[in-house]
């Protein structure tokens, strides 16, 4: 889990646009965030296995 101060800091609008970055909406992780779902890879995997993300299923070929 991310520190509360870092999550609050990220929600503010930055002085410069290049300073903006994505953060997981569920756990606050700043790295490996899928933009479409606003989740990190770990949270995405957990929710996908539980079937809580509509339209996502395990790949098989």
Swiss-Prot record:
Pfam families: Ribosomal_S14. Binds 1 zinc ion per subunit. Its cofactor is Zn(2+). Zn(2+) binds at residues 24, 27, 40, 43. GO terms for molecular function: rRNA binding; structural constituent of ribosome; zinc ion binding. The keyword Transport does not apply. GO terms for cellular component: small ribosomal subunit. GO terms for biological process: translation. Keywords: Metal-binding, Ribonucleoprotein, Ribosomal protein, RNA-binding, rRNA-binding, Zinc. The keyword Methyltransferase does not apply. Binds 16S rRNA, required for the assembly of 30S particles and may also be responsible for determining the conformation of the 16S rRNA at the A site. Part of the 30S ribosomal subunit. Contacts proteins S3 and S10. Belongs to the universal ribosomal protein uS14 family. Zinc-binding uS14 subfamily. This is Small ribosomal subunit protein uS14B. It comes from Shouchella clausii (strain KSM-K16).
């Amino acid at each position: 889990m991310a520190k509360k101060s870092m999550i609050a800091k990220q929600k503010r609008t930055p002085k410069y646009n290049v300073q903006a970055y994505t953060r997981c909406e569920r756990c606050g992780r700043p790295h490996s965030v899928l933009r479409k779902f606003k989740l990190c890879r770990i949270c995405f995997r957990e929710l996908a296995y539980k079937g809580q993300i509509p339209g996502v299923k395990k790949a098989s070929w």
